[in-house]
Amino acid sequence: MRKHKAPPSGSPRTMAQDNSQSEPSGGNGESPAATTAAAASVEAPQQSLLLGHNAADASAAAVASRLAPPPCQHPINNSNNNSNISNNSSNSSSSKERPRPTVRFISLLHVASYVLCLCAFSFALYGNVRQTRLEQRMQRLQQLDARIVELELRLEQQQLLHWPAEQTQVLASHPSDRDSSNSNNGSQHLELHVRRELHRLRRDVSHLQLTRRQQRRQAAEAAAAAASGEGGSGGGQCQCQPGPPGPPGPPGKRGKRGKKGDSGEKGDPGLNGISGEKGAAGKPGDKGQKGDVGHPGMDVFQTVKGLKRSVTTLHGGTLGYAEIVAVKDLQEAGVNVSASTVIKLKGEPGEPGPPGPPGEAGQPGAPGERGPPGEIGAQGPQGEAGQPGVAGPPGVAGAPGTKGDKGDRGDRGLTTTIKGDEFPTGIIEGPPGPAGPPGPPGEPGARGEPGPIGPAGPPGEKGPRGKRGKRIFGPGGTKIDEDYDDPPVTLLRGPPGPPGIAGKDGRDGRDGSKGEPGEPGEPGSLGPRGLDGLPGEPGIEGPPGLPGYQGPPGEKGDRGDIGPPGLMGPPGLPGPPGYPGVKGDKGDRGDSYRKMRRRQDDGMSDAPHMPTIEYLYGPPGPPGPMGPPGHTGSQGERGLDGRKGDPGEKGHKGDQGPMGLPGPMGMRGESGPSGPSGKAGIPGAQGETGHKGERGDPGLPGTDGIPGQEGPRGEQGSRGDAGPPGKRGRKGDRGDKGEQGVPGLDAPCPLGADGLPLPGCGWRPPKEPIISTPVHKDYLPDVTQPESNTSDYEQEEEEDDEQAEDNENEYDEYQDNLHNNE
């Protein structure tokens, strides 16, 4: 008989081993289930928090899931475990195994679940506090928005209440009363400025209100969408409330260039074109009748007193510019000669007159004095050709023949300096004369009627962004229905503005239409006798012959020799005014003496309600720069001859002047080679003075004359047409800091190094207008003349700049107040 007999089901040793082997397997099978349950309990509250569920509910569900029995165990396993436990307890003495860690693992899971519950509770408490603070902030913002809307409504109501009375009062005023109400211009301008600022404030507040309403609408839509999502999906979406609106974004980039505008209207007709070229010379007319005998002439050299030596030495010689000087004193002898007629003698020669008929040869008479030109006689029949007479002394120059072909240009002539040196030169034109003193101001003209309103100018470029303005709050008004769907655009447009102030004179308007041609002028007086012609070739002395026929146009002559250098000529007659000089650099800005006087005289009369301001006159400033040339006025009537001026003081010896113009032709030189003898014409009788012919074509522009002396003061010309508006000049650079001013009148005058008071100290403003010392007594300035247009333009530009600066400062203050209130 054996000691260890195996039963049918197996030996106990084998069962114990099986049980021991099954227990680890059972323990191993239990540990993955517990790990899975713990992981599920940890992930459950996290998923509930992410989905928006309450943290407390999630933690409670997690604890319940941990306390529940594991769902993966079966009853068979429980029975097996019980049997295993009993077997283990019965066989504990026989088997040596490690203790199981199941109880310790479960206690660790409980501690972790408790920690997670505490964390979830703290997170829930923090979310509740934060949500409460956000709700309080939203309530404050809503109260502020309601306050802004209420203030805006009050301001609009006040504007609507005060507007009808002011509009009816402005519209009822007659245009004629506007001129008499110049004293109210300042108050009207202030009212217009206030209304403009109120309109700008209303526009900004309306824009702010629209933005706030849009934000409210978006918040309401988001809340409604969140509520609908929560009811439909059962808490599957986030229920977070939207946060406060963010700050406004930065300004966007500049937009693209706009499309091309519509074509403009048809422009005004252009100016008249330039005059055409001079027409061809007409055919020679018929021969005139024989004229009467002319009056005896007058010896210029015996009549005129006080001739210069250069003129008397040329008596009987070659004539030139020097003989023109002899005409200056012919007025005292009864001959009507003026500077205008003398200058006209320098023009182009007129068309040749009709030749007279040939007369019979008369007996040689005694040489008579030179008489004035006779009148042109009636045209007579053509006589027979007479016998050629004996060549007489040089007669009076005949009528100028037709203009021949232009000859070749000669070599440049020679002239001499004061020392007698010769040097080649052409027609030397002297430098332009110095600018004459400013003419006296004319009498102030009557105030013109206001000009018509000019056409609207082209749209200007987009200006820079203005500064912030002030924010003005009006009294409260009734509160309207706060409907978010109502568009606030109606608040942007205000009532129509009152009619503007009457504009100034329309000097910037368009040029008027060309006037009708004036009536033909009266025939001019008989002009002086022309200058004698050049001496002819020396011939046999004989009786003076009568003027001959006008010969046919001569052939082109040969090129002549260079003549000897001429003598220095006498000073010429006053020439026409020179061309305007080059515009100088811009001078320093003068003192505001005239501007202060203008504001004191004109500004006080326009605004009598303003307090009177007493200005302290400063010392007279330096003379300003010469202004631009004014518009050319219409030619005035010829003034009366002024009386002879007082003899001036003897001046100092001046500097040596520039080289003068070429002098007159020199004395007759040696006789050149005799040319081909021409056929002597039959001397004709002097014709009668012809009638004034029709006005000829405009001649070519003449060369610049010698700068003339200062002429007498002319009468004030009529006001010219308004010129085109000039472009507005850019603002000049800031000037340098001025010198130290004159000490005050109340303080004692400081003494200089020489012990005398400093110059300018103790100066008192004059009681009368300051008049600068004139060059001549005829050039006294007229204080009553209105100021020039340039000063008016400067005044307008300065006023515009001041107004723009005031507007920018007010807008800056308004923007600052607006941001502070927000």
UniProtKB/Swiss-Prot annotation:
Residues annotated as transmembrane: 105-125
MF GO annotations: extracellular matrix structural constituent conferring tensile strength
InterPro entries per UniProt: Collagen (IPR008160), Collagen_Structural_Proteins (IPR050938)
Localization of this protein: Cell membrane
All ranges on the Cytoplasmic side of the membrane: 1-104
Domain Collagen-like: 241-299, 350-409, 430-469, 493-526, 527-586, 621-680, 681-740
Stretches with biased composition (Acidic residues): 793-815
Disulphide bridges, residue numbers: none
Pfam families xref list: Collagen
Top-level taxon: Eukaryota
Biased composition (Polar residues): 11-25
One GO cellular component, as annotated: basement membrane
Keywords, in A-Z order: Cell membrane, Coiled coil, Collagen, Membrane, Repeat, Signal-anchor, Transmembrane, Transmembrane helix
Biased composition (Basic and acidic residues): 284-293, 403-412, 504-517, 583-602, 638-655
Extracellular side: 126-822
Topological category with respect to the lipid bilayer: Single-pass type II membrane protein
Compositional bias per record (Pro residues), positions renumbered to this chain: 242-251, 431-443, 567-579, 619-628
Region of interest (Disordered), residue spans: 1-45, 66-99, 169-188, 205-297, 345-822
Biased composition (Low complexity): 76-94, 360-402, 522-540, 658-668
Coiled coil: 131-162, 194-222, 790-822
Protein name: Collagen alpha chain CG42342
Originating organism: Drosophila melanogaster
